[in-house]
From Swiss-Prot:
NCBIfam families: PRK12497.1-3 (NF009150), PRK12497.3-3 (NF009154), PRK14678.1 (NF011271). It comes from Roseiflexus sp. (strain RS-1). InterPro entries: Restrct_endonuc-II-like (IPR011335), tRNA_endonuc-like_dom_sf (IPR011856), UPF0102_YraN-like (IPR003509). This is UPF0102 protein RoseRS_1723. Gene3D superfamilies: 3.40.1350.10. GO terms for molecular function: nucleic acid binding. It comes from the Bacteria. Belongs to the UPF0102 family.
Length: 123
């Protein structure tokens, strides 16, 4: 079961990268890791860095995937974004946000993608 879930997640990340590229984003990093965790995708468009969390689920509603991000995950994503900026010596005033690309895969193989800009904000 874990292998199947990992393959679905990897497939979803590849779909998200293609989607972002089609919408004018330049992918800066994929699966960026540090001791605190992983950022699925870091992309840039119009001078703004987007730290992208990809959520892939089976079903017909991408909202189900987006809704699976807990408060703890939101806090971790904020921390990871700050760690990425520091690790790459980017200025503190670098514009950035955390997006979610939610992907739903229906049983018929139809794919729905929802790109939620600034889905995670500081609280």
């Amino acid at each position: 079961m874990a292998e199947r879930r990992r393959r679905l997640g990897d497939w979803g990340e590849a779909v998200a990268v293609a989607y972002l590229a089609q919408h004018g984003y330049q992918v800066v990093a994929q699966k960026w890791r540090c001791a605190a965790g992983e950022i699925d995708i870091v992309a840039q468009r119009d001078g703004v860095l987007a730290f992208v969390e990809v959520r892939t689920r089976r079903g017909v509603d991408p909202g189900m995937a987006a809704g699976s991000i807990t408060g703890a995950k939101r806090a971790r994503l904020m921390m990871l974004a700050c760690l990425f900026l520091a690790a790459h010596d980017l200025p503190a005033d670098t514009p950035w946000r955390i997006d979610v690309v939610a992907i739903a895969v229906a049983s018929q193989g139809r794919v729905a993608i929802d790109h939620i800009l600034a889905a995670v904000e500081e609280t």
